[in-house]
């Protein structure tokens, strides 16, 4: 079994640009402050927020953007208008590394995902 490249969130952030690391940390902290029942886990070498064993929101970094996924095509579809400025796909949306997180949007996405899961709400 292969070992994780990033065993911790901090080790993941250490490989990012300062702007991307600051934005990633701000997004995760913003969600966890509003939803303390969620836990941060590294899975597939990227940070994921979980409710029990269910994935609620995932984050990843690329060279020119950060990606955020609520783990649900239905949630993405329901928020299509609000996500339009953020290069959405069926599964995720992209933000610039220096993005100032939209707390209301992140909270609403998580809330919708939790309703969909029927737990941790």
What annotation goes with each model-predicted range?
Residues 1-121:
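Charge-dense, helix-prone N-terminal extensions
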């Amino acid at each position: 079994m292969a070992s994780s490249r990033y065993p911790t969130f901090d080790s993941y952030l250490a490989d990012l640009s300062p702007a991307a690391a600051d934005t990633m940390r701000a997004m995760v902290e913003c969600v966890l402050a509003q939803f303390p029942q969620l836990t941060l886990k590294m899975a597939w070498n990227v940070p994921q927020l979980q409710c029990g064993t269910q994935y609620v929101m995932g984050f990843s970094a690329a060279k020119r953007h950060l990606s955020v996924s609520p783990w649900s095509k239905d949630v993405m579809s329901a928020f299509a208008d609000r996500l339009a400025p953020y290069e959405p796909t069926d599964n995720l949306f992209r933000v610039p590394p220096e993005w100032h997180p939209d707390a209301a949007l992140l909270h609403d996405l998580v809330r919708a995902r939790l309703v969909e899961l029927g737990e941790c709400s």
